[in-house]
Amino acid sequence: KIKETNA
């Protein structure tokens, strides 16, 4: 499972 976060 890959989690990607962008702010």
From Swiss-Prot:
It is found in: Secreted. Keywords: Secreted. GO terms for cellular component: extracellular region. Expressed by the venom gland. This is Peptide 1196. It comes from Tityus stigmurus (Brazilian scorpion).
